Design a protein with these regions (language model features):
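Short alpha-helix in the alpha/beta-hydrolase fold that links the catalytic acid
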Residues: 177, 191-199
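Conserved HGGG/HGGXW glycine-rich cap/lid loop of the alpha/beta-hydrolase fold
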Residues: 1-37
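Active-site loop/oxyanion-hole signature of alpha/beta-hydrolase fold enzymes
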Residues: 29-70
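Conserved alpha/beta-hydrolase catalytic His-Asp/Glu region
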Residues: 109, 121-174
Length: 234
C-alpha cells in the first residue's frame, strides 16, 4: 500500500496515524514532493494533474502495475489527482477528509488567517492554536504531536496554502478502482455535505462514510479503522 500524508507534514509523522494499517499491509510511505521531508524541493501546481502524474511515477518506480492507496487531506487530493492522471495504477483507494473533491470556498478558512499572521509576528503559541482551532473544532483534538508538527513546519519551511483543486468528473470517471471516501461533518475545509454527494456522483465504484460531529483534525475510532482495513483487503 502507498500512503500519502497531509499538507505541510511528513510521512514519518503520518505513519503515527496509519499504524493500524501496518499489521495487514506492506506500507510504502513517501514524502510528497515540495513538502517538508526528503523528497525534492520542487513545488508542483495543485491546480492541474501534476501531483497525480508524480504519484503515478512513484508507483511505477516501486515496481507495481497498480497498488492500494490511502491519503488524507492534501494527500487525499494527491490520490484523487492520481485516480484521474493514472487511473489504472490505483487498485483500491481510501480518501480521508479529502481535498480535491469538493473544496469549501476560500472564505471558509479566513478565520484562520488573522491568528496565522499574528503567530508569524509574535511566535506566541496561543495564536497558532487559535489558527488551528477551526480545523480541530475542540482544543482536545490539537494533540501535542499535531501541534509540534504544525509548529515545526511553519517555523522551518515554506508553507503550502493552496490545496489540490477539485478534479473534473470526466477525468475521475476513468478510474474504476473501489474507493472509500470519508468526510467530516464539521470540516471547514472539505465539509462532508459537499464532498460526499459529489464523490457519489463522480466516482464510479464508491462507498461514502460520514464522520459525524468531527472536524478536519480528528481521530478515527477503532471500528472505523477496522472498516478501512477490511475495505482495502477487499
Amino acid at each position: 500500500m502507498l500512503v500519502f500524508h497531509g499538507g505541510n507534514a511528513t510521512t514519518a509523522y503520518n505513519l503515527l496515524a496509519c499504524d493500524f494499517l501496518m499489521k495487514d499491509f506492506h506500507i510504502y510511505a513517501v514524502d510528497s514532493i515540495g513538502h517538508p521531508g526528503k523528497s525534492a524541493e520542487v513545488s508542483l501546481s495543485p491546480n492541474n494533474y501534476d501531483y497525480g502524474k508524480w504519484a503515478g511515477e512513484v508507483i511505477e518506480a516501486l515496481g507495481y502495475d497498480s497498488i492500494c492507496c490511502f491519503g488524507g487531506s492534501f494527500g487525499a487530493g494527491i490520490l484523487a489527482k492520481t485516480m484521474c492522471a493514472a487511473p489504472h495504477k490505483v487498485k483500491r483507494a481510501v480518501l480521508y477528509v479529502p481535498s480535491g473533491i469538493k473544496n469549501a470556498p476560500a472564505i471558509n478558512s479566513m478565520s484562520m488567517m488573522f491568528p496565522m499572521i499574528m503567530y508569524w509576528i509574535t511566535h506566541q503559541d496561543k495564536w497558532l492554536k487559535k489558527c488551528m482551532l477551526p480545523m480541530a473544532v475542540t482544543e482536545k483534538n490539537i494533540t501535542e504531536d499535531i501541534y509540534e508538527t504544525a509548529k515545526l513546519s511553519i517555523n522551518h519551511s515554506k508553507v503550502k496554502t493552496g490545496m489540490p483543486s477539485n478534479v473534473k468528473e470526466k477525468d475521475m470517471r476513468k478510474c474504476e478502482a473501489p474507493t472509500l471516501v470519508m468526510a467530516a461533518e464539521k470540516d471547514c475545509l472539505f465539509p462532508a455535505k459537499g464532498v460526499l454527494p459529489r464523490a457519489e456522483r463522480i466516482i464510479k465504484n464508491v462507498k461514502t462514510y460520514l464522520l459525524e460531529g468531527r472536524g478536519h483534525m480528528s481521530s478515527l475510532r477503532d471500528e472505523e479503522k477496522q472498516m478501512i482495513v477490511e475495505f482495502l483487503k477487499g
